[in-house]
């Protein structure tokens, strides 16, 4: 009888403390030595756990930390014991049972260091997922066995594709009523376009969930003892042998299509060994040509240890992923440099700041080291502003707890204190190499709300909170609107802004009032419009003189959130030193349109010719000429308003399908697809964000509280003519003006 099995028969508190000691004893390390040790690059994995909201990511991470001996006992997400999950360290997260910030931790499994980032599933916190994926080498995509592929799963999948992150899929919640992992697999193939196949099968689902079948090693695995800590290996049950053979054959066929080596064995009809299949799984997973699908239920402690084995066996180490830096020099194209992932510290240090957080000891900056080594006392430079920083303290994170380390190497994720920087900044030890890493993609905010502190005495704390949150989160914007004399905050959704309002009260003692949500409309041109503007001012002494000629035209619909400036001038009519002034003036005018007061976007400004005066011309004069040219185009061009369109997914019982479809149509929604299963239906639609406010309460009342929906930003699209007229009228009234006689889009 092993030490662990003997302990399982004792009393619970003793059992749990001894269990942890026993697990550390098995690994042959004391707790601190085990985690502080530096490993060779083959023994490191940087992984993220991503999924749709409520798929069980945080519960899965909690189980991983428990089985690897990182925590002594497990807690649930909405903790009945008032403790909450380890990774949900923010009080608000424990209350709501959702993950808001990406918590970072590291642990050890089979002598491999695993750095884990637990990411939010709610679409309003999508920038947290972007940041996490940017610095990871692999990911676990968690899917619900009942819900399957949902809207945020599609978003996470797109983000993984953007950053080329290899992934494993884990179908969780097999114990839930209505779970169907086979349907989820077919959705992965049809909706996510993954070449995916099971490498495990469930032995029973719902209340009959007993264990799993490993198709690679052809054996059954049962999870026994306290918290499923003992693995019992057995033969595949008699009633599952035919299905196991069929699914193993399917796995080999999918792998053979993606892997040349295995494909040759398959065509020559040679026998496969377990090692052949494992090697092919690793090669194809790293290349993103195949996605291994695992199954389990984290809440019921089944399938987690084999998932950890798969992370070690199939996901890449930092040396197997190519990371690039760019050398930027004026007047030259960006030059790509492949970074050296070796953990010897011979190359200069390169690191990327992917997250900022205001902790108890000042600003905490999370970094990933991509090349070289960093030690306490070293100096590093910010590639963006060339500021020098001395490293006083290096820490590794376990949720909100810190462990000091003396040095970090390529592949490590760590944090620094007191570094003044922005998310996405590159740090290096050599300030002269002009190298920087690609910055993190940040989506534009789509919702604004007026915000004000309830008490005037809290203004100082309000300012501190705003300053901290805007620095931490690049999707959270803040500005004071002079026209309406209100402070506006903008973000990715109502929940996003509500959570910041609650954090202000909780963390800064500053209760605030949020106004009604406002949509971030845009204004754009319908067709090209030429301009020829002369700015001339003579008031004694040197005057101002600038003439610019060109055309403003719409960009293609796929680029309608961008602004472009093109200098097409030839000769010296517009001296080159004044061209930046024209661009600056154009971009300043694009901050506020004249139709509705919203930003201009989807426009290209082509500067073709102009004129200057040898004495009176200056950059300021050309900037003011650009202001005048944009005003001229506003008067002469045809304009339209763009609005954000959201991808909406609604799930409800079948008897409410008619009501749900009717409500979406009433809100100008376009139904793009429907599907149904076992008494429930899901409808997919594209709906203008402006029409989605108040939908949550309408859905609850029309489905007796059983319906739920998610939405995410899709694109900007022209709004309907009557909506445009209403927006323009409201803007004119707010400015105290009558409706202008203005050319509108002819429909």
Swiss-Prot record:
GO terms for cellular component: mitochondrion; nucleus. InterPro entries: EFG_II, EFG_III, EFG_III/V, EFG_IV, EFG_V, EFG_V-like, EFTu-like_2, G_TR_CS. GTP binds at residues 51-58, 118-122, 172-175. It holds the Pfam family GTP_EFTU. GO terms for molecular function: GTP binding; GTPase activity; translation elongation factor activity. Keywords: Elongation factor, GTP-binding, Mitochondrion, Nucleotide-binding, Protein biosynthesis, Transit peptide. Belongs to the TRAFAC class translation factor GTPase superfamily. Classic translation factor GTPase family. EF-G/EF-2 subfamily. This is Elongation factor G, mitochondrial.
